[in-house]
Regions:
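Extracellular Ig-like/FN3 beta-sandwich strand-entry sites
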Residues: 162-164
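Primarily the internal scaffold of c-type cytochrome electron-transfer domains
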Residues: 1-160, 173-188
Length: 189
C-alpha cells in the first residue's frame, strides 16, 4: 500500500509517539510528561485527516485517500476555554488568576524561539477614562509561562478610583511578529 517510487517506504511506529517529538523538544516533552495526560503530541499538533500519503502529482494518484497525519503542526489556537480568568477587586487591590485548563504543557512552551503571551490591563474610572494600565509578558525564557492546570496569581495595587478593568490576552508565536487575540474580558467593581 505504500508506493512512492523511486525509493522504498515503510511505516515507522515511533512517528506517532510523543517520545519522537521529545527527541528535539525536550523541555516541552518534559512538561507534557509531568502532566500525566495520555494524549500524544501528534493528537493535538498533527491530528489525523483523510488525505493521500503524498500530494505531489502524479505520485498522489498512486495512493488512496486514507487517514494520515496533518503536517500543518497546529499550534497557538488558544481561546477562553483554554486559559481561564478569575478576577476581583478587593479594596485597593485588583487580584486575578490565570489557569491553563486544556493545554497539557506550559503555555507558551518552546525549546527554540521565543513565543509569548501578552496580558494588557487597562483600568478605567466611572467616567470610562483610563486611569492606569499595566502589561505582563508570559514566556518560557522568563519562566513565566502558564503551567498546565495550576493557577498563576497576580495582584496590582490601585492608586486611583477604578470602576473596571479591561483585560486583553494575546499570543505571539516564535516565528511571527503578529499577536493573535486569545480573549478580551471586562471586570467591573
Amino acid at each position: 500500500d505504500l508506493v512512492a517510487p523511486p525509493h522504498p517506504t515503510y511505516r515507522n511506529p515511533d512517528y506517532v509517539r510523543s517520545s519522537f517529538c521529545g527527541s528535539c523538544h525536550q523541555k516541552t516533552y518534559k512538561e507534557w510528561k509531568g502532566t500525566g495526560v495520555e494524549d500524544t503530541c501528534q493528537n493535538c499538533h498533527m491530528p489525523r485527516k483523510k488525505d493521500r500519503l503524498t500530494d505531489k502529482f502524479p505520485l498522489s494518484l498512486l495512493h488512496k485517500r486514507k487517514w494520515v497525519g496533518n503536517h500543518k503542526f497546529l499550534h497557538g489556537d488558544l481561546n477562553e476555554k483554554d486559559i481561564l480568568l478569575e478576577a476581583e477587586f478587593k479594596g485597593k487591590l485588583f487580584n486575578f488568576n490565570l489557569l491553563n485548563k486544556t493545554v497539557p504543557h506550559n503555555v507558551p512552551s518552546a525549546d527554540n524561539g521565543d513565543p509569548r503571551l501578552y496580558l494588557y490591563i487597562t483600568f478605567l474610572n466611572e467616567a470610562g477614562e483610563q486611569v492606569d494600565q499595566t502589561k505582563e509578558i508570559l514566556a518560557p525564557q522568563q519562566d513565566t509561562a502558564l503551567p498546565f492546570n495550576k493557577k498563576v496569581s497576580f495582584s496590582y495595587r490601585l492608586f486611583n478610583l477604578v470602576a473596571q478593568a479591561n483585560i486583553v490576552l494575546k499570543y505571539q508565536s516564535a516565528w511571527s511578529k503578529e499577536k493573535d487575540l486569545v480573549w478580551e474580558k471586562t471586570i467591573r467593581q
